[in-house]
Amino acid sequence: MTTTTNQTTTSGNAVKWYISGPISGYEIEERRKAFEKVEQLVKRVHGTNDVFNPIKNGLPEDAAYSDHMMRDLEALVESDIVIVMAGWQHSRGCLNELKFARRLNLQIIGENEVVNDELDKYITSHPLKPYLS
């Protein structure tokens, strides 16, 4: 779906975000913090609570990898924008999510683009003042 600047789809529904980032092979607490940071960034910058965080997919941590992927892909189908975390190119799960997202014609952005959005908002709301000596 195409999105508009006010964070609604062209059909008027709220934009749904999906976070794609590597999980397997990392300490789960480190990943939990990294995903939480991206989730909070999207919520703050884009004023939404509609962010799917795979770390919080409702399954037990020790559930089978395939069960986690199925749950995550179900959420991906319902999403409009995928935000990709660093390290995606080395993650089988991320690569599968991104291939699927492409097939669904979802917008895919890197987490740095959200940081740039936040910076743009800050600069706009806090104009530079002339330096007075």
Regions found by a protein language model. Name each.
Residues M1-S133:
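Conserved catalytic or regulatory cores that recognize and/or transform ribose-phosphate-containing ligands
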